[in-house]
A protein has these predicted regions:
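Short helix-coil boundary/hinge micro-motifs
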Residues: 1-152, 156-163
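Cysteine-rich micro-motifs
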Residues: 168-177
Length: 177
């Protein structure tokens, strides 16, 4: 399964993993809790700027109030699921919220002339397309085996998303000890 998503790191992201996991980590890390809280998606304009940099939203596109609110819910639901990964537990509520948020992507399977198969958004609007890119990143990271290794730091006031490459437990790059 392949998807189309950016490989660059916009502001607020780190590159602990590559490909689809990188997009998820970068998006989750648009909310930074320490040393002081910084929300890179705080306003519609700031969110659009970050999304433009991440190549998730066309340069001429913006976000409506309802799309901005949905974007914040999408990020929160991803962060909740990553927290569950960190704690090694299932969280049916977080999984259901993420499922609802990703449904805005309206994914379909497309088949190209050479029988190449990919997931894409059935919508032509910018917001559903960016959600589809995030949904494809989740699906691709699950297929690659990296989805459950995406976690959030358990340290108080950190919450940084990261790819856990430690073989003996969770290690946030900001709190390696």
């Amino acid at each position: 399964m392949t998807g189309s998503h950016p490989s660059g790191t916009p502001r607020g992201g780190s590159n602990p993993a590559s490909g689809p996991a990188h997009l998820i980590v970068s998006f989750a890390n648009t909310l930074i809790l320490e040393p002081e809280e910084t929300d890179l998606l705080r306003t519609r304009e700031e969110a659009a700027g970050w999304l433009h940099t991440a190549a998730l939203l066309p340069a001429e596109a913006g976000l409506s109030n309802s799309e901005h609110a949905a974007l914040l819910r999408l990020r929160a639901s991803i962060r909740d699921v990553l927290t569950a990964h960190t704690e090694g537990r299932e969280d049916p509520g977080a999984a259901a919220r993420l499922t609802r948020a990703l449904a805005d992507g309206r994914l379909v399977i497309t088949v190209g002339p050479a029988s190449t198969v990919r997931l894409a958004s059935a919508a032509r609007a910018s917001y559903p397309s960016l959600v589809a890119d995030v949904a494809v990143a989740v699906a691709d990271s699950a297929a690659a085996g990296s989805w459950l290794r995406l976690k959030s730091c358990a340290a108080p006031r950190c919450g940084r998303a990261f790819y856990d490459s430690a073989s003996s437990g969770t290690r946030c790059p900001a709190h390696p000890a």
